[in-house]
Amino acid sequence: MKSRATQTKELDMVNGPLARKILIYSIPLMFSNLLQVFFNMTDVAVVGKFAGARALGSVGSTTIIITLTTGILLGMGGGVNAVTALHMGAEDYQRVHKTVHTSVILCFIAGLLLLVAGLVFSKPLLEVMNTKPELIDGATAYLMIYLCGSPALALYNFGNGVLSAVGDTKRPLIYLSISGIINIVLNLFFVIVCRLGVIGVAIASIIAQYISATLIIRFLLKTYGSYGLRMKDIAIDRDAAAAVLRIGVPAAIQYSLFAIANICIQTSINSFSHVVVEGNSAATNADSLIYDMMAAFYTACTSFIAQNLGARKKERVLRTFFITLAYSFLMGLVLGVALFIFQRPFLLLFTSDDAVIHYGQIRIGVMAFVYCVSAFMDNATAAARGIGKSVMPTIIVVMGSVVFRIIWLLTVFAYFKTLQSLYLIYVISWTLTAIAGNIYFAYHYRRI
């Protein structure tokens, strides 16, 4: 096998100044996440501007379900990332090789299962969420087409997990940029020229997903060394599969249950008028923007902690935890304040309807200054995965951010029935989950 320096030429995570290296590692991830959000926002903006408020509401009504399915694949990718990084840190390149060739099968199967589930359950799920009758046909069409891209998204997340684990966060950014630009061009063509509305946006999205997956898999097939992909070696190794699934499945379950709690919230929002639903849909684009920018540091947290754990450098594990927490908190705070200041121009990107903008501003007014609180929760979860713990963090998130939210909806929101009482659910659940998650990480860090 090649030496570590040859294989991880982009970044050595176990030596050198952590703060600078974490930032270098995270910046391409931030741009990747920012581009991904920008391309998703372009979908919504094109629909809102050229297909009308009803089409905007249709696409917005699918956001939680898409987040759920994407979260499952992100969870699997997170498992690939953590296990690969651990073995890279330990310089166990044979296990890296087995992890990569096992994971590609696991992720692809997950993508296929989501595709089938999407085709079968899209409309029933939207009906359970009390989607407005005037929106459900467009929402169903968009969702069913969009989920046909699940296998491609699964393979992209696999490749991204592998490359991030070995310190390469630049190539995924390049591939995402290429596919994203194509996505924008196709959006405009299908919606404005072909007048396909939400269907056109969905088709453009899945074409872009397959392009990004093709690019990243093509690179791995041409890469030498332990993390390169070889068709003849693709097979499931039981130990590698168990290691990836031990982290990936709880993470996927966490994302799924978290999204289910948000489905309950969306159902509550759907109890208001369609104008409120559309305003909320426009404002939630900020959620993706801010969360995903912060998430770059969580990926760094898991990767750096796993590699340094593998290299038996315990002091760098704790320093990584605090550095990524500081970075993610500041990112959430700065972006939240900027959103509050520029809330109207932001909402005008998606709609020109004053009533819709008004209800979007209500959501932003509550959320803008509390996004940063989520850093304490998500960073602790990422750190726990980095040290190989995923089941209990999932249970903590389920109790604090799923069960608690459902109880809140059935009690506090049911009593007040205001948007403010609904939106406060986020910061309170984040705080409770963060307290438990940080206690858990601190306990297990001492036992490393």
Tell where the protein language model's regions lie, with residue ranges.
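Short runs within selected transmembrane alpha-helices of multi-pass transporters and secretion channels
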Residues: G77, I145-S164, P172-N183, V201-I216, ...
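Small-residue-rich hydrophobic transmembrane alpha-helices
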Residues: L56-V116, L153-P172, Q266, G279-Q343, ...
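Short alpha-helical transmembrane segments in multi-pass integral membrane proteins
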Residues: M1-S26, T84-P151, V193-V249, I305-V370, ...
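Hydrophobic transmembrane alpha-helices of multi-pass small-molecule transporters
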Residues: L68, N183-N187, A213-I217, L289-D292, ...
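N-terminal transmembrane alpha-helices
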Residues: M13-F50, I64-G79, V83, F108-L115, ...
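Small-residue hotspots at the loop-to-helix junctions and early N-terminal turns
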Residues: A51-I64, T140-L143, A202, H274-L289, ...
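Helix-terminus/linker motif at the lipid-water interface of multi-pass membrane proteins
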Residues: F38-L56, L126-P133, F189-L196, S256-L289, ...
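Transmembrane helical elements of multi-pass membrane transporters/channels
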Residues: I24-D43, I145, Y156, S179, ...
